[in-house]
Amino acid sequence: MAQLFFRYGAMSSGKSIEILKVAHNYEAQGRKIALMTSNVDDRSGVGTVASRIGLHRKAVPISEDLDLFNYVSELNKSDVESGNGRVACVLIDEAQFLKRHHVLECAKIVDELKIPVMAFGLKNDFQNHLFEGSENLLIFADKVEEMKTICHYCGHKATMNLRINSGKPVYEGEQVQIGGDESYYPVCRFHYFHPNKQR
């Protein structure tokens, strides 16, 4: 039975490497996947899923106006007609940047096309507000799973993302600022509020 999955975690929790692993596993069994990512994240180029350990792969960029249901329906139809087989799974990286309509389209892919959708992304931003995509995935997903990582400062479980500028914490600004290890640290709640204190 197809389901909508949301796997979330703080920065550096292995979300992108996990999605690349899932894609590989499906394809190793001869099954077709649709690999997609938000066009907002351009750190490695628009339409690229890239992990911090260096693995990367091209993906379909999701723009604000892309209808995911129609895209997957057409992809599925053309693949079946050409003999390439049906799409077995839709994989979406950087899902926090999805709009509400994208998440509803993902649910429609699951419910009407019977294709599982696995979305990976951050849950909360650097101010601990939910991203639009994450909020709607938490509402509409059949299964939600946390991907764990450790606090940059103490090694406890990290649940938050601390924005950094020149080594100093930043608590105000635009919600979206694309960056990696140089801009964000995964942190526990204590070190989110007290980054310079020992726990």
From Swiss-Prot:
Active site: E94
EC class (word): transferase
Catalytic activity: thymidine + ATP = dTMP + ADP + H(+)
UniProt protein name: Thymidine kinase
Top-level taxon: Bacteria
Subunit relationships: Homotetramer.
One annotated GO molecular function: thymidine kinase activity
SUPFAM superfamilies, per the entry: Glucocorticoid receptor-like (DNA-binding domain), P-loop containing nucleoside triphosphate hydrolases
GO terms classed as biological process: DNA biosynthetic process; thymidine metabolic process
